[in-house]
């Protein structure tokens, strides 16, 4: 969904048929407002906020940038426009910034806990309907990378696919003839044997799903000895407390759905000058 379309729908959702305050406002006037943080975090949502302000005729006097850290009471944005319009966009603007910054802030905590320049932290497709682009953009601002945006990015075979595949190697040979040349094939594995079979069958990426650190290390050792070109990804209930141990297991990437679905709004408010 285009950013402008997304924002128009978000604003329409809040405005309905119009802000009733306009009916009782005797005279409109120019006003200045500040968006301030009420807790610390990592700023995200700048691109969406600026587009929202532009489409509603509000001037952004000053803003901090995506990926910048902030503290309580910091001024994040200074905006100026018609008093009535500032009030119209207030909740939509805050929702965007709070949600996006919440994801970026939690993601940054996982990046810090990961503590590795070699292992990439990835998000997942566990996103809210119609918010995937927005939420994955927020993950990038927190310092992680995106996994697949959709089913058309790469072929990923999970247990629900594999239970109907009798010969994995033959299936992958068939798949490569029908996929774009650049498309990767990733296979989700829940044991050492499944990971070994996936590598032997020709997978580009093997996901170690819900495996212990020790099991993941064993798979990484086998990969290093026999298929060093295969990428390994760890996934499944990996927390802030366990992510560093998985980073040391020999994998190339770690995917964490919690970056998005466990993130909470960062508290902010907008006040008139």
Swiss-Prot record:
Its EC number is 2.4.2.19. CDD domains: QPRTase. It comes from the Bacteria. GO terms for biological process: NAD biosynthetic process; quinolinate catabolic process. Pathway: Cofactor biosynthesis; NAD(+) biosynthesis; nicotinate D-ribonucleotide from quinolinate: step 1/1. It is an enzyme of class 2 (transferase). The gene is nadC. This is Probable nicotinate-nucleotide pyrophosphorylase [carboxylating]. Hexamer formed by 3 homodimers. Belongs to the NadC/ModD family. It comes from Helicobacter pylori (strain ATCC 700392 / 26695) (Campylobacter pylori). Involved in the catabolism of quinolinic acid (QA). It catalyses: nicotinate beta-D-ribonucleotide + CO2 + diphosphate = quinolinate + 5-phospho-alpha-D-ribose 1-diphosphate + 2 H(+). One of its GO terms (cellular component) is cytoplasm. Keywords: Glycosyltransferase, Pyridine nucleotide biosynthesis, Transferase. One of its GO terms (molecular function) is nicotinate-nucleotide diphosphorylase (carboxylating) activity. Substrate binds at residues 91, 124-126, 148, 158, 188, 209, 235-237, 256-258.
